[in-house]
């Protein structure tokens, strides 16, 4: 198998890692492309291509996230993660972790973490990497990575609701919400929204958007 063929085989995994670290499809695609350039230019073939490329895309994504956060501080309006409509990477053994980690709620929780914490959390909690692999990927000792994982988990848990809704119940409510939204059913939307719901808008840093969050079921339902 050529390098190009091996890379294409692993591209879905690499993109999925980058996306969960960055929260942006375009930035994840750029990180994957940079990973390919570094792999193509490498003078030797790594023993484990998967481990090598996973480490490279992780390091690239950390660097991109650090610079992206500086840009986001100057962002016009409120920056929100970019939804991923279809995840190209599938692993039956980690389907629940993969599905949960691309929800908007999960991506917003990951915004609470430093770039290193986020990378360690993604590799460990979402993809099930061992600490030796994670240490190699982020350039830290295994002990340091374990500490980063503990801190990341604590920050994420602090941001989670006290009670998790059943997955099927969430899917049913989401379906009812989108049906009401599509049909312009204001009363139906109001019934589904909590009294203290907040609506935040993201205009991509360019397009007109909400000047501030809208609070309250009645107001949000009528937007």
What are the residue ranges of the model-derived segments?
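A short glycine-/small-residue-rich loop at the edge of a beta-strand within enzyme catalytic domains
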Residues: 164-168, 180, 207-215
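A solvent-exposed, acidic/Ser-Thr-rich amphipathic alpha-helical stretch
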Residues: 195-223
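Active-site-adjacent scaffolding segments
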Residues: 1-30, 34-36, 40-174, 179, ...
